[in-house]
């Protein structure tokens, strides 16, 4: 079977991966899996050489189960497959990094987006992603659990007209800042923040926006 062409700019060639990957004495190498949309770490699994070859050939994640002592195709049963967008190795060539498009936004067998959904205290807490995603999750938290001292909570409770008015005001301030050449970053941050509030109010996930942006790259 011909190798699947998933290589993106900056990723190593398939030949380099095959030659560079350093397997341990058990013939395994750890593979960290991250979401292409926002960089969230989804899971860590193990590959042997055959799992790596199948991943390269099919463009989907294959791993080696140490407990069952067999290959497994991620998502073959659940439907939560991982389409490889890029594959890299670290400076010592003994860890792989798979950047994937996660089908169904679920990587964990417990039904969570990430296997790392517990913090050091055992509380539910998804791992950090990019800054916009983190801010959006805070906005969602304010929506789910309003706080009287929170500007975000008050804005959400005020409704769409208030939110839309603020977005219009912030957009105007971005234009004025760009003309003056001052405070552009701060004003854009304000505009983005209020846009995130609108997304939460409209029950639109930021990952859907990222998917739309991915389409703009083509």
From Swiss-Prot:
Signal sequence range: none
Domain of life: Bacteria
Protein name listed in UniProt: Histidine biosynthesis bifunctional protein HisIE
Organism of this sequence: Gloeobacter violaceus (strain ATCC 29082 / PCC 7421)
Gene Ontology molecular function: ATP binding; phosphoribosyl-AMP cyclohydrolase activity; phosphoribosyl-ATP diphosphatase activity
Matching Pfam families: PRA-CH, PRA-PH
Catalytic reactions on record: 1-(5-phospho-beta-D-ribosyl)-ATP + H2O = 1-(5-phospho-beta-D-ribosyl)-5'-AMP + diphosphate + H(+); 1-(5-phospho-beta-D-ribosyl)-5'-AMP + H2O = 1-(5-phospho-beta-D-ribosyl)-5-[(5-phospho-beta-D-ribosylamino)methylideneamino]imidazole-4-carboxamide
UniProt GO cellular component terms: cytoplasm
Gene3D superfamilies xref list: MazG-like (1.10.287.1080), Phosphoribosyl-AMP cyclohydrolase (3.10.20.810)
